[in-house]
Amino acid sequence: MDAWSILLQNKTDKHKIYSLHEPHVSCISKGKAHKPFEFGSKLSISRTRDSGIILGALALPGNPYDGHTVQAALKQIKRIIGKQPEILIADRGYKGQKEFGKTRLLTPSVPQKTDSQYDQRKQRNRFHKRAGLEATISHLKQHFRMGKCYLKGESGYQINVILAAAAYNLRQWIRLR
């Protein structure tokens, strides 16, 4: 990476450099009105439904489509807990493939007419629990130093994510005791 390659970048170039200090940073389109683009790396956070313990935390290089990150997250969960989960609840960004081996991927959708009231309530409760993950991510950013990474490179970012998840789990463990 030299100064001329940065200066000669065009608007439509694929692999642009957005930061001199962190060249692995990519542009992520969020679609928010006040901030349509963010610069950084994508994360994949997996946690349990009831206790809120983080089972997997991955920093993903580039800007991959959410649906393509499920395999890596499932592989990490299986390595950590020894078995693959039966149900994975995700947001609407994970549309596409619904089955990953023994794991079923559920995303929010309009209930079907054939669903009973019980099934509809069960689905609604599942997705309300999934929405709690946003609070977990917010806590990781504010209280566990994931808002800004002070370690260099992609490996430094991965280390930062894992350490933040470990610190969060320690706090949860202390609260559960």
Q: Where are the regions that the model predicts?
A:
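Polybasic low-complexity intrinsically disordered regions
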Residues: 1-86, 92, 99
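Membrane-interface transmembrane-helix boundary segments in multi-pass integral membrane proteins
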Residues: 156-160
